[in-house]
């Protein structure tokens, strides 16, 4: 399902297309930052970690640029209900992407700290695995938004549950290790902060997925029972209702 339908105003189509293109660019940039920061941590690559920290401002600048374009779009075009819902989702989504960039920066800073203090004896395999999972979640959420695919968005919500469980399991294991051997407490705690940052990336991917369901069903599914969300997605899919389209 296309993210937008054609409108009578070609200039509106062009303006909206420009915003969506920047939105996708920002999302992919944020996902890339998470991957690069994690690689820098595991490889003890200080130069790459510092580049992630330095490049965070690029994501911030994109957020400001998209915000400005959204404000102009609303002021000039006064979008109707269906299009306004999409514009609202874009506005909310860039906040999540900006925060993903912030989490990548935190991971990079922890990488620099661990390089300075010496490697942690535990936790790197957990970081690698969780990083792979949340990056795929984020990319799937971006793809679901691009295609306005509520089923794919719901799969992201399911993945978030698995990520949360893995995060909790890894945290318990590392806390047990600290209690049994306190010689490397500060280093392991830095790894715990990295795991926390990755778990938050998963939460932001979930938020993007919820925006897809909002756009396609017209229902705000934040803080909604999981089974109820599944029903909404199924009903939307069965009925062929995609609320971002102007019929």
Task: Give, region by region, the residue ranges found by the protein language model.
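Cytosolic, long alpha-helical scaffolding segments
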Residues: 1-247
């Amino acid at each position: 399902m296309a993210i937008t339908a054609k409108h009578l105003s070609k200039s509106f189509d062009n303006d909206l297309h420009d915003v969506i293109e920047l939105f996708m660019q920002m999302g992919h940039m944020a996902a890339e930052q998470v991957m690069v920061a994690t690689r820098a941590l595991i490889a003890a690559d200080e130069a790459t970690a510092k580049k992630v920290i330095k490049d965070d401002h690029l994501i911030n600048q994109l957020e400001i640029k998209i915000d400005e374009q959204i404000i102009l779009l609303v002021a000039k075009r006064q979008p109707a209900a269906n299009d306004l819902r999409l514009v609202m989702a874009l506005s909310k989504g860039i906040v999540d992407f900006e925060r993903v960039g912030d989490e990548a920066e935190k991971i990079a800073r922890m990488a620099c700290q661990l390089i300075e203090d010496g490697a942690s004896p535990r936790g790197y395999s957990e970081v690698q695995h969780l990083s792979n999972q949340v990056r795929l979640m984020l990319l799937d959420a971006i793809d679901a938004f691009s295609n306005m695919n509520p089923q794919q968005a719901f799969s992201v919500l399911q993945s978030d549950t698995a990520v949360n469980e893995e995060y909790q399991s890894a945290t318990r294991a590392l806390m047990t290790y600290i209690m049994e051997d306190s010689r490397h407490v500060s280093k392991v705690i830095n790894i715990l902060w990295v795991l926390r940052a990755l778990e938050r990336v998963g939460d932001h991917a979930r938020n993007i997925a919820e925006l897809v369901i909002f756009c396609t069903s017209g229902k705000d599914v934040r803080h909604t029972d999981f089974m109820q969300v599944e029903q909404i997605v199924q009903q939307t899919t069965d009925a062929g209702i995609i609320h971002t389209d102007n019929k």
